């Protein structure tokens, strides 16, 4: 069995304790609680309970889902979509994908290095069954047949 890993990467405009980030930080727990109660949500496998891996001005938010469709509903409908509309208040553009989707064996918790490999692959190769996006998605079957370039 396979599950969908979603890694969201963001470059913050300021440190998490800066007043500019206050609304974002204040809403993290609510958004995470909504994710946990959403159909298809499996887990948020990170070292910190709030689901964020923080490295300087970069944030990595991981979540595991049963399907692309379940994640897509959570992401683009409801309260989370309102936060997405405000993302430019808190996050800067940067070169590279701001998220990646990929299929992983159920129960496997990806490391930061594994996620980085998928992000780099998406940036260099475009969407493939190894690393893809909502707009260019692939099935587990396609992933199993895919050979890395």
Question: Which role fits each region the language model picked out?
Answer:
Residues 68-97:
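An amphipathic, aromatic/His-enriched active-site/gating alpha helix that lines ligand/cofactor pockets
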Residues 19, 62, 71-75:
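Conserved aromatic-histidine-acidic binding/catalytic patches
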